[in-house]
């Protein structure tokens, strides 16, 4: 049986930390779906389609990685895709409490669902999408925090939004 895992998130925008978790999960699972959440409650900087496009560009050379958007419950999305594993990243103890609650909620909705937690590598432990967004908004250098092949695209999308296009 081939194993399929889902790595869900808002990815607003994707960071090197996210990409590292995707690559490391590929060592464990045959196929990984990077599931981009609509997440209107977080009021993302980039639209769902833009975040999907950024992730597709960031993962274009990774075999057996698929990028899809979703706007349903994660437990339902996993069931629809036939996945039994959810991948999550934990940067700090504060992440663990939140992720534990979400993991239990998902398991209550889909008892076959397991959540696997990855710690970031030391070089990526401080990176978050909110830190990257703040740096972008203040015209700081951010390209070392995001996948190299997506940095220019992320910046062009940001400037397009800033101009109101």
UniProtKB/Swiss-Prot annotation:
* Catalysed transformations (reactions): (R)-4'-phosphopantetheine + ATP + H(+) = 3'-dephospho-CoA + diphosphate
Q: At which positions is ATP bound? A: 10-11, 18, 89-91, 99, 124-130
**Origin organism lineage:** Bacteria, Pseudomonadati, Campylobacterota, Epsilonproteobacteria, Campylobacterales
This protein is called: Phosphopantetheine adenylyltransferase
Q: Where is this site: Transition state stabilizer?
A: 18
- Biological pathway: Cofactor biosynthesis; coenzyme A biosynthesis; CoA from (R)-pantothenate: step 4/5
Q: Which InterPro entries match?
A: Cyt_trans-like (IPR004821), PPAT (IPR001980), Rossmann-like_a/b/a_fold (IPR014729)
Asked whether the keyword Signal is assigned, the reply is no
EC identifiers of the protein: 2.7.7.3
| Chain sites annotated for binding substrate | 10, 42, 74, 88
* Record function comment: Reversibly transfers an adenylyl group from ATP to 4'-phosphopantetheine, yielding dephospho-CoA (dPCoA) and pyrophosphate.
Primary localization: cytoplasm
A GO cellular component annotation in the UniProt record: cytoplasm
Cofactor(s) of this protein: Mg(2+)
Q: How does it assemble?
A: Homohexamer.
Gene transcribed to yield this protein: coaD
Molecular function terms in GO for this entry?
Answer: ATP binding; pantetheine-phosphate adenylyltransferase activity
**Record family assignment:** Belongs to the bacterial CoaD family.
What Pfam family is a match, any one? CTP_transf_like
Q: Which SUPFAM superfamilies does the record match to this protein?
A: Nucleotidylyl transferase
Keywords (alphabetical) are: ATP-binding, Coenzyme A biosynthesis, Cytoplasm, Magnesium, Nucleotide-binding, Nucleotidyltransferase, Transferase
């Amino acid at each position: 049986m081939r194993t399929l895992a889902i790595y869900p998130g808002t990815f607003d925008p994707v960071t090197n930390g996210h990409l590292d978790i995707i690559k490391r999960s590929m060592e464990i699972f045959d196929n990984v779906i990077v599931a981009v959440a609509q997440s209107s409650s977080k009021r993302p900087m980039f639209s769902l389609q833009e975040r999907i496009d950024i992730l597709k560009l960031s993962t274009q050379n990774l075999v057996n990685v698929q990028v899809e958007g979703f706007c349903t419950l994660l437990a339902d999305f996993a069931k629809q895709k036939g996945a039994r594993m959810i991948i999550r990243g934990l940067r700090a103890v504060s992440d663990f409490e939140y992720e534990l609650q979400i993991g239990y909620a998902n398991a209550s909705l889909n008892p076959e669902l397991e959540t696997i937690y990855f710690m970031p590598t030391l070089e990526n432990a401080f990176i978050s999408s909110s830190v990257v967004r703040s740096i972008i908004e203040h015209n700081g250098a951010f390209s070392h925090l995001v996948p190299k092949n997506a940095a220019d695209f992320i910046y062009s999308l940001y400037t397009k939004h800033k101009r109101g296009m």
